A protein has these predicted regions:
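Basic/polar, cationic surfaces and motifs that engage anionic cell-wall
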Residues: 2, 7-8, 13-16, 23, ...
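Active-site-adjacent loop/helix surface patches within enzyme catalytic domains
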Residues: 46-176
Length: 187
């Protein structure tokens, strides 16, 4: 075999080796990036109040339909209204409602806010069923902290908005999210 032919073969082998090495390194880097992007968000420290608004923590039982306990990465804060204009449909009554249906329905959210208190139902880093999008990989249920605002007639709606804004600001800061991460049910 001639010297030139051996050089060409060695160059081809070297090129193949470099190409395979680059592919392996790229795969490792992508796997590391995917791991850090997809691993669940670490849960923040619990609070008993947000800006002087009491926060009552009353988690739904883990392993129920409403709280399967699946951890995820937080990407959004999703703001809703309860749609319940019934008398006494305040945060405490919505908390009772969630506990009553927890075993039987895929319906849940993380917080209920009214004009004087906030109920905390599911840890922020677990999925809940509030956005109507199932478990869509980019959807609010899988990626969003759900906040429901009470709209009952005896509720001071303006104060509820302020309370929800304070809670949202606290969550944005706690999870290092920007304002673009705030969504509504319809987004």
């Amino acid at each position: 075999m001639g010297k030139r032919k051996r050089i060409r073969i060695n160059i081809k082998r070297m090129a193949a080796f470099l190409l395979i090495t680059a592919a392996v390194i790229t795969s490792i880097i992508l796997a590391i990036c995917f791991y850090f992007e997809s691993r669940p968000t670490e849960l923040r420290e619990p609070v008993s109040e947000v800006g002087a608004i009491p926060v009552i923590t009353d988690f739904l039982p883990e392993g129920t339909a409403a709280r399967p306990g699946q951890e995820r990465k937080i990407k959004y804060i999703v703001i809703h209204e309860t749609g319940n204009a019934g008398k006494n449909a305040h945060a405490a009554s919505h908390n009772k409602y969630l506990h009553d249906i927890a075993d039987s329905q895929l319906k849940s959210w993380h917080y209920t806010v009214d004009d004087h208190e906030i109920y905390y139902h599911i840890p922020d880093n677990e999925i809940a069923f509030h956005a109507g999008d199932g478990l869509n990989k980019d959807g609010g249920n899988l990626n969003g902290v759900g906040i429901e605002m009470c709209v009952n007639p005896e509720n001071d709606y303006e104060q509820t908005l302020k309370n929800a804004a304070k809670l949202t600001a606290m969550l944005l800061e706690a999870y290092d999210l920007d304002l673009g991460s705030v969504k509504t049910h319809h987004d």
